[in-house]
């Protein structure tokens, strides 16, 4: 079902003000659709601007259908990255074999990549004139009443909204305030990873290289005169760390990969010198419901599938459309729309999350024998 402009009068009640926390893919997509449904949209983002940086975003068949509805398909097509070739490499930097996939893997009709910042800009441009954006601020408290939900912001200001959407990522503040502590919903998958992007080509442009050791995974992805360095390691137990302490995270990566083979010493130097660094545990967010009262979660905040799914940005875009379709279907009845969103979209997210968990078993082999078998089917 498609959200249509004429649905606006039917969906927007007396209080048409909605607040979206987070201005990345989930937030921008939700802002787009809620505006189309006739709501007055405010987006609050803790950063001083859009959250730039990060690896390219995959646009597959399902996401392609959504961006067509948003009028972004042609622009994404025009900005897609060239198809890459990939190979597994040995410790001596010789090729171990091409990247292959199991024979039963479905081949999508559309399988594009686009730079994250490019897609972010396209989505922001699509909604920037139809929503109010408040940067360098965040939600500090929520106070729901029968008629609305009061929001206290970090700067001390207060305002009431009809609905609040948490589109603020795996460490969602909205989820913590409304649904409880993160630990209830985080499922650790036994790995940690870092992403660093350097403005130079460490391998041939348009190629990907993967190197494995037992319990270790390294990927180089080269495009547009830059290279993504992805370092991932297995851990049976969770490592205590502060997700806001970058120095601590850099130390963890350095210690985990010290003394490893291939080009890892060189790559660690690149990571150390770079200002681009992201680290987190590989986890999934699993919740029985993504809605509570006047609050709903979209994207990683509600159903993060982990980077192993290869569709974090896409899943957020698809999820925002699923929520909007539920609003349109039920003509703005929030209770029914939220129920529909939970019931209809849960099976999809569960399938994506299961696939991501299976991918990790192949990407990060636990034994030397697993490394060799992974050379055949990464």
In which residue ranges do the predicted regions lie?
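A short coil-to-beta-strand element that immediately follows conserved catalytic motifs
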Residues: 186-190, 205-207, 262-279
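Acidic/histidine metal-binding catalytic segments
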Residues: 79, 132, 259-275, 334-339, ...
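Conserved mid-domain beta->alpha element of the FAD-binding
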Residues: 19-36, 40-48, 165-166, 194, ...
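Conserved N-terminal glycine-rich FAD pyrophosphate-binding loop of Rossmann-like flavoproteins
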Residues: 49-65
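Active-site substrate-recognition segment that forms the wall
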Residues: 196, 207-239, 257-259
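Short helix-loop capping/hinge motifs at secondary-structure junctions, enriched
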Residues: 200-206, 238, 263, 288
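A structural signal for isolated positions on well-ordered beta-strands in alpha/beta enzyme cores
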Residues: 19, 42, 132, 228-230
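Conserved N-terminal helical subregion
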Residues: 2-18, 35-37, 60-197, 236-254, ...
